[in-house]
A protein has these predicted regions:
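Long, intrinsically disordered, low-complexity segments
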Residues: 1-21, 102-105, 109-110, 145, ...
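Flexible, polar/acidic helix-loop-strand segments at domain edges
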Residues: 32-114
Length: 250
């Protein structure tokens, strides 16, 4: 794409279409599993995900997600709010790029690393080196929990570390949730699980969004450790050499 147009990651990831206001693509959507991964009272949940019936600021309008005028096209019945609300269509300097949404660019930049990620990386190293319950790891994780308005009672277990990375860094281009699961050895099991979506409908009598029973949907995800444990070597790396062999399966 044209790099001077500004960040496109956010626009690519809001639900497909934009109610005739701006055309997004819906490439990445939160699952019900991610929604449920947040503890009760975790302020990051509503800052990360827009759930049916919630309001988002979009193209200068306050939109009730899933209402009669603003239906939901997302495969999971939800969409990402993080870095998106309020949505302002332009490049990173505020200049309009293309009002029909073909470029889906946003005034917001894309975070490549945050201080919270640094704290989580150190906590992970301490837990994996010294064992669960490490005192310094508890302090680091409690800093993350405090910011999310959660009790500062971290057990500093591997399970909590993994979940904190999932919740804190959801929908961030780097670090990648996929790469986390690969290096932990969790990717094959995670991708084999069915994906659940949130179902909802607009009740015209009540004039509100009503949440229905969730359902599974086929997301087409697979993970073969023999192939997907690593990425393919870029084609350009083979230029001028006969000593490289492409990774298996690519």
């Amino acid at each position: 794409g044209n790099a001077v147009d500004g960040p496109k990651f956010h626009g690519m990831s809001f639900q497909n279409g934009g109610w005739g206001l701006y055309n997004h693509w819906g490439y990445f959507q939160p699952t019900l599993s991610l929604w449920n991964a947040f503890e009760s009272g975790d302020t990051r949940r509503d800052a990360t995900i827009i759930y049916p019936g919630q309001t988002i600021r979009f193209m200068g309008r306050d939109i009730v997600f899933g209402s009669s005028s603003y239906s939901i096209s997302s495969d999971t019945g939800m969409s990402f709010r993080k870095f998106l609300s309020p949505w302002e269509e332009a490049d990173c300097k505020g200049k309009e790029v293309n009002s029909n949404g073909d470029n889906a660019s946003n005034t917001l930049g894309t975070c490549l690393i945050r201080f919270a990620d640094v704290l989580l990386m150190k906590a992970e190293a301490l837990i994996w080196k010294n064992g669960e319950g490490d005192a310094e790891a508890k302090q680091l994780l409690n800093r993350i929990r405090k910011r999310a308005r959660l009790p500062e009672n971290s057990p500093a277990t591997k399970a909590e570390l993994k979940n904190q990375r999932r919740c804190e860094l959801a929908f961030e281009f780097m670090p990648s949730r996929h790469l986390d699961m690969v290096r932990w050895g969790d990717a094959k099991e995670a991708y084999a699980k069915p994906t659940q979506r949130v179902n909802s409908h607009w009740d015209y009598d009540l004039q509100q969004v009503v949440i229905d029973a969730p359902s599974n949907y086929d997301n087409g995800r697979t993970f073969d450790p023999v192939i997907n444990q690593v990425f393919p070597i870029p084609v350009t790396a083979f230029n001028g050499t006969v000593n490289l062999t492409q990774n298996q399966g690519y």
